[in-house]
Amino acid sequence: AVTDNEIVPQCLANGSKCYSHDVCCTKRCHNYAKKCVT
C-alpha cells in the first residue's frame, strides 16, 4: 500500500532547521540561520 507520505512530500514549516530550499514549504532556506523562511 502507498502511504500519504509517499504521495505528498513532507515540507518543513517556517523556523524549522533546513539545509536546502527544497525541504521547506516556502522553498526558502536561510543560508546562515539554517531555518526555513518566508
Curated annotation (Swiss-Prot):
Cystine residue pairs:
11-25, 18-29, 24-36
State the protein's purpose.
Potent reversible, competitive inhibitor of tyrosinase (phenol oxidase) in the nanomolar range.
Q: Which residues carry this modification: 3',4'-dihydroxyphenylalanine?
A: 32
Please report the organism this UniProt entry assigns to the protein.
Answer: Musca domestica
Q: Which GO terms describe its cellular component?
A: extracellular region
Subunit structure of this entry? Monomer.
- What post-translational events are described? Contains L-DOPA (3',4'-dihydroxyphenylalanine).
| UniProt keyword terms in alphabetical order | Disulfide bond, Hydroxylation, Knottin, Secreted
What the entry says about domains is: The presence of a 'disulfide through disulfide knot' structurally defines this protein as a knottin.
**Protein name (Swiss-Prot/TrEMBL):** Tyrosinase inhibitor
Per UniProt, subcellular location reads as:
Secreted
